[in-house]
UniProtKB/Swiss-Prot annotation:
Species the sequence originates in: Mus musculus (Mouse)
Binding residues for heme: H55, H79
Gene it is expressed from: Cyb5b
N6-acetyllysine PTM positions: K30
Protein name: Cytochrome b5 type B
Residue numbers covered by the propeptide annotation in the UniProt entry: 1-11
Keywords: Acetylation, Electron transport, Heme, Iron, Membrane, Metal-binding, Mitochondrion, Mitochondrion outer membrane, Phosphoprotein, Transmembrane, Transmembrane helix, Transport
Phylogenetic placement of the source organism: Eukaryota, Metazoa, Chordata, Craniata, Vertebrata
Length: 146
């Protein structure tokens, strides 16, 4: 197992590529101001301080995500291929492997209960349709016989 070695503002992990610097999430979280703005996108750390004033959506949008994992927000906006290419120039390293969430380790119950929610998704409308059918038939039959 690789053990991290401290190296100033980042960490190098033994056995990793020599050019990759790893940052702990605690360190990224400290860089959340206009003077120093870091964010994580897809497990990679970016220093976007110089880009704040150039961002088409305004610097406020970036500062809201500063010091945190902005992957979901970045993807929700639907950035162009040019924007993704531009992002590369702000890359400074990767999130330390021990800070990365394992894929499939989702603690969000709404995502883990897909079987449970799928039957409920269909059950309620079907019961509702049957109930409406009985009520319609009952009242329609009553109005026809009068």
């Amino acid at each position: 197992m690789a053990t991290p070695e401290a190296s100033g503002s980042g960490e190098k992990v033994e056995g990793s590529e020599p050019s990759v610097t790893y940052y702990r999430l605690e360190e990224v979280a400290k860089r959340n101001s206009a003077e120093e703005t870091w964010m994580v996108i897809h497990g990679r750390v970016y220093d976007i301080t110089r880009f704040l004033s150039e961002h088409p959506g305004g610097e406020e949008v970036l500062l809201e995500q500063a010091g945190a994992d902005a992957t979901e927000s970045f993807e929700d906006v639907g950035h162009s291929p040019d924007a993704r290419e531009m992002l590369k120039q702000y890359y400074i390293g990767d999130v330390h492997p021990s800070d990365l969430k394992p894929k499939g380790d989702d603690k969000d119950p709404s995502k883990n209960n897909s079987c449970q929610s799928s039957w409920a998704y269909w059950f309620v409308p079907i019961v509702g349709a049957i109930l409406i059918g009985f009520l319609y038939r009952h009242f329609w039959a009553d109005s026809k016989s009068s």
